[in-house]
């Protein structure tokens, strides 16, 4: 019988190495790796209140989310952020545009909203699940990014196609894996769906 000498030598080296390391470690100081754990955040029972203020739109939002004016450099009128307290793990960004009875302007807003989502999908090599909105207040699309680490995992836009255009997006300003934040993401997504279900244009 012929043996493959390189293979035999490799096997013997593996056995010797295993015996050497096991002899150097006692039972007390041997290291057993522990699985990574995810931090846990207690979430309150969901409760809602009507949006206050002079906005061209209305909805019910979480009582635990503070409404803050968007003060970024490119912010426009009626742009707001819903910040959850005290965790502030997830935020909901609301942007608003006037359509001005301009079909080209409407399509520009739609394309911009889709472009933002698809750019994040391509960056994270993720996929999106979309749902069409068809209600008395207009039409739109809901996007859920199914996997990958992206800052926006859930967003939607809604418009009456002639006067108003609104986009709502959940942002997660953290580098943690989205899997570890699953309960918070679901909680915030449910809040956003409630916002959509109670959504109305004011004028």
Regions of interest found by a model, annotated:
Residues 111-167:
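Signature of long, low-cysteine stretches enriched in small and polar/charged residues
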Residues 2-6, 19-90, 101-107, 123-132, ...:
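N-terminal targeting sequences that direct proteins away from the cytosol to non-cytosolic compartments
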Residues 6-14:
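Sec-dependent N-terminal signal peptides
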Residues 96-98:
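Short beta-strand-to-loop capping motifs
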Residues 93:
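His/Glu-rich zincin catalytic helix
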Residues 14-19, 146:
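Intrinsically disordered, low-complexity coil segments
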């Amino acid at each position: 019988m012929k043996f493959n000498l390189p293979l035999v030598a490799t096997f013997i080296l593996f056995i010797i190495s295993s015996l050497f390391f096991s002899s150097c470690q006692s039972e007390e100081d041997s290291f057993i790796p522990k699985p990574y754990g995810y931090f846990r955040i207690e979430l309150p029972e969901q409760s809602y209140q009507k949006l206050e203020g002079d906005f061209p739109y209305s909805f019910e939002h979480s009582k635990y989310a503070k409404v803050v004016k968007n003060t970024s450099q490119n912010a426009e009128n009626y742009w707001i952020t819903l910040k959850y307290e005290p965790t502030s793990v997830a935020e909901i960004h609301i942007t608003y545009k006037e359509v001005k009875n301009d079909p080209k302007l409407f399509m520009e807003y739609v394309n911009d909203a889709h472009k933002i989502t698809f750019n994040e999908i391509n960056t994270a090599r993720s996929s999106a699940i979309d749902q069409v909105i068809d209600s008395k207040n207009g039409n739109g699309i809901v996007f859920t990014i199914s996997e990958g680490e992206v800052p926006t995992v859930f967003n939607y836009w809604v418009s009456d196609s002639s006067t108003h255009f609104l986009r709502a997006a959940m942002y997660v300003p953290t580098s943690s894996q989205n899997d570890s934040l699953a309960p918070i993401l679901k909680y915030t997504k449910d809040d956003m769906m409630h916002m959509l279900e109670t959504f109305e244009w004011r004028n």
